[in-house]
Amino acid sequence: MIAGLLLPLTTVFADSDKWEVSVGEDSSSYKTVASLQQESLTTIKDEYAKQDLNPQLQFRCTPGETAITARIDWQRFISSFSTELGFKVDGGKFTWLKWKVDQSNKVTFSPSAADSQKLIELALGGEKLLVEVTPYSASPVTVEYDLEGFSGALAELKDSCSQ
């Protein structure tokens, strides 16, 4: 089981066909969360270099709260401890943030809402987001996300959480 898997109660598609907003139960905490997610446009290989994977970028909040946290489900082993992720929008420079890794060792997440806000501010107004991570004892992997419609989808997520 992937830690933190969202079991949807309702799904609302955002303005862009790339972003999906849903409200459901988090399988690891059993709490209701609202989530904005997108699968990567590019693939990476699993830790055995046999399968192509599309990591999923998610922004989450709990209804009734304003804090948004970011996470990426890489669907492959990343690390058993905190790791640095690089985020680059369009032709800019990488911004490196130290993120935590969940118990499955496959999901990285921001340690705080303030850290997630850095990523949100970086992504707003951009067209493409590149994310780079170096799995433990492996070569770096990079994935790309389409930021078209992100601003509107983020507004929908915030609306879902403010209720």
Language-model segments: residues:
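Bacterial N-terminal signal peptides
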Residues: 1-8
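A generic "folded-domain core" signal
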Residues: 13-163
